């Protein structure tokens, strides 16, 4: 069973990686996500793609999900969202707004269709393992959505209209005086959704409306900088769709209503002491979701309501020291408290962690090196250290870059506490923390026909760990243009997957979760900037 799963994953991982990206941007653009401090995109040895303000405006898209899809990233056209970066699903990609993790993962996927692009300054996509700096969920990379910071006093009214009766209206204003600046934006949007298969019941993407409200206030005297930002995202959708059950793949015609809300608060204080910069960051990211589904099941009308809330609270201190123009050291530490409340997981669940990281950036002209590591300690899964080193060497118009780094992802609440289906429903899915007691109960009542796994293999999960390798070469045509190719591979240990555990005497199938054998994801990608 484990070997079959491994072969399937290898097949998937090599079939979706080849992509070509094009963008109109300056090679001298500054990036921050790969190092937690500003460096030139051209100098960065870590593969990073920047989608700038001008390109976002030229593409004339509505949501963050649309933007990723336009840039060649595979996106699932479903309410649950989800995407793939270098063949790894969104479970392995950390997504942030201004460096703050976005809460709202459902079944590992993160829906970005509720984030409008009107307030987005640029998007930085860092590819490859970044657990050495960002920790959990960053095995496949990091997507950092950077919002607009304000500017000259102005007032704007913007409208957009597109296919599927997609409309958008936005109102924004910048104002400030001397050391104080404020930028506010309100955006309203509507869409009729779309149906990729008219021969089936319902729509692929349901009709929806969205509301985005953002505000950032900043005070700076050149030495001290205070900033407070708030981003609120709401999405409502309603319509007819289909739900696939685990009983012989039966499709159920369903009327669905879904409401989701994100609120991200970020309070920052930064002080410059000559070559030393210290920053205190206090953030809170919350998410709530309500899903109501009405359908007919075996001749009976059924109404199902699923509600959930999530919250990520994270205080952090970031310190950087510029030894000279060629050397910069970054040291940071903090803690994270993650809470998830839903009946599917048996009520409120909590996962706490603390972390610290150290990184050094060395620029020797033709040779640039970034080396560092991060230590994470979890209340339930122990500790993990994730080192990484990256280098870039320039020879004439050619540049060679390479990286090797480790990553990790701890089990999520779904794989530990999920309860789905039941003994009398044809299928039963249980998280690792619950399955042993249920098996013991049904075995004592002689209700289990057979098991395919030993209980000790499915009653506890370990964190996934990985080692990623990256090698690339690029050719600089001129100041604005270059072409390149990157070869990469990620070797993952203790991959967490759902597995067939056994069967009850009434033919109900039992599923659980376990750490399967090692898996490898590898591929090649081409890049073109002009």
What positions do the PLM features span?
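Face-selective signature of the C-terminal outer-membrane beta-barrel domain
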Residues: 183, 214, 218-237, 255-381, ...
């Amino acid at each position: 069973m484990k070997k079959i799963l491994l072969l399937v994953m290898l097949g998937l991982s090599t079939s979706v990686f080849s992509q070509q990206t094009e963008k109109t941007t300056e090679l001298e653009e500054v990036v921050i996500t790969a190092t937690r401090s500003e460096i030139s995109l051209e100098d960065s040895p870590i593969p990073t793609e920047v989608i700038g303000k001008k390109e976002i405006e030229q593409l004339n898209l509505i949501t963050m999900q649309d933007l990723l899809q336009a840039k060649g990233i595979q996106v699932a056209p479903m309410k649950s969202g989800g995407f793939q970066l270098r063949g790894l699903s969104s479970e392995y990609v950390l997504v942030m707004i201004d460096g703050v993790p976005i809460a709202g993962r459902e079944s590992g996927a993160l829906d970005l269709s509720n984030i409008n692009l009107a307030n987005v300054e640029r998007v930085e996509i860092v590819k490859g393992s970044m657990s050495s700096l960002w920790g959990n969920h960053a095995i496949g990379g990091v997507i950092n959505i950077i919002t607009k910071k304000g500017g000259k006093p102005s007032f704007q009214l913007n409208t957009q209209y597109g296919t599927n009766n997609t409309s958008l209206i936005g109102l924004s204003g910048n104002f400030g005086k001397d050391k104080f600046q404020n930028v506010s934006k309100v955006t309203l949007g509507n869409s009729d959704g779309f149906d990729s298969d008219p021969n089936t019941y319902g729509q692929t993407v349901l009709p929806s409306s969205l509301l985005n409200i953002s505000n950032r206030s900043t005070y700076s005297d050149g030495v001290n900088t205070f900033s407070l930002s708030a981003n609120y995202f709401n999405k409502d959708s309603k319509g007819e769709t289909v739900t696939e059950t685990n009983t012989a793949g039966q499709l159920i015609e369903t009327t669905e209503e879904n409401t989701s809300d994100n609120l991200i608060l970020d309070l920052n204080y930064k002080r410059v002491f000559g070559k030393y910069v210290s920053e205190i960051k206090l953030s809170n990211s919350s998410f709530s979701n309500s899903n109501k589904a009405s359908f007919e099941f075996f001749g009976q009308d059924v109404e199902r309501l699923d509600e959930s809330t999530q919250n990520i609270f994270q205080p952090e201190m970031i310190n950087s020291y510029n030894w000279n123009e060629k050397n910069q050291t970054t040291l940071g530490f903090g803690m994270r408290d993650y809470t998830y409340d839903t009946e599917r997981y048996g009520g409120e669940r909590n996962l706490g962690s603390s972390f610290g990281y150290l990184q050094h950036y060395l620029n020797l002209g033709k040779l640039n090196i970034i080396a560092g590591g991060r230590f994470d300690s979890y209340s339930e899964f122990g500790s993990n250290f994730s080192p990484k080193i990256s280098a870039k060497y320039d020879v004439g118009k050619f540049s060679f870059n390479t990286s090797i780094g480790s990553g990790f992802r701890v089990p999520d609440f779904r794989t530990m506490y999920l309860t789905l289906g039941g003994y009398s429903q044809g299928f039963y899915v249980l998280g690792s923390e619950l399955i042993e007691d249920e098996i013991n109960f049904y075995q004592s009542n002689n209700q289990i026909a057979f098991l395919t796994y030993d209980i000790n293999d499915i009653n506890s999960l370990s964190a996934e760990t990985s080692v990623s390798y990256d090698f690339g070469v690029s050719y600089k045509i001129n100041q604005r243009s270059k072409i390149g190719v990157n070869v990469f591979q990620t070797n993952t240990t203790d991959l967490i997957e759902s597995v067939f555990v056994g069967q009850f005497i009434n033919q109900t199938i039992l599923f659980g979760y376990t750490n399967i054998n090692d898996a490898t994801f590898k591929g090649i990608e081409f890049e073109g900037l002009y």
